[in-house]
Design a protein with these regions (language model features):
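Glycine/proline-enriched, intrinsically flexible loops and inter-domain linkers
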Residues: 1-190
């Protein structure tokens, strides 16, 4: 159909198409491009200690684990929200709202120690993010990788580097869609 959007304070005439997409993901599987997420790495001998000093939740202690952590204001309000993935010892990967990148990045840089114990690097433009979500997402992704994606091997809130076809991606078993799914973080060149 060739649809011309009609502005309205009610449901737009695009509603049926959006509804169809949402239902398909909820009942089957869908692929979403979330490359607009902001991304940075936090590395160095004091990476874990520093992150624990700037977010309210405890950052992941084990390699391969993911935590949802919030940076709070002095009054206890939420200043920022980060998905924090522990890639390796002293190496963390932070994912946060693309619309807040400038704001959140500013706070991270201002709070970073100047003694060289922590390096905070913006890597948003280096990595893309594809979200594969829905009840059939495991089946689709399993057909593209030799990594066992079963619950025992790939737990909720965990991540690992996997082969996807002929490429590699960091697969994070987390998403905010409310269905089974993975975020596939990959080099833009992939």
């Amino acid at each position: 159909k060739n649809i011309v959007e009609k502005n309205s304070f009610r449901r737009s005439n695009y509603f049926e198409f959006i509804e169809s997409e949402c239902l398909h993901v909820a009942e089957h599987v869908g692929l979403l491009d979330m490359s607009a997420f902001a991304k940075c790495s936090v590395t160095g001998p004091n990476a874990e200690g520093w992150l624990n000093s700037v977010v309210a939740n405890v950052v992941p202690k084990s390699v391969g684990r993911i935590g949802l952590c919030h940076m709070l204001s002095k009054n206890g309000g939420v200043r920022a929200e980060f998905t924090i993935y522990k890639r390796s010892e002293n190496n963390y990967y932070l994912v946060f709202a693309g619309s807040q990148e400038r704001h959140d990045w500013d706070y991270l840089k201002k709070l970073a120690p100047s003694d060289g114990s922590v390096t905070v690097q913006k890597i948003t433009s280096q990595l893309g993010v594809l979200v594969l979500a829905g009840p059939k997402s495991r089946e689709v992704l399993q057909s593209l990788t030799d990594t066992d994606l079963g619950n025992d091997n790939f737990k909720w809130l965990s991540g690992k580097t996997i082969n996807v076809g002929y490429a590699q991606a960091e697969a994070l078993r987390v998403n905010f869609i409310g269905e089974l799914g993975w975020e596939l973080h990959h080099p833009i060149e992939m």
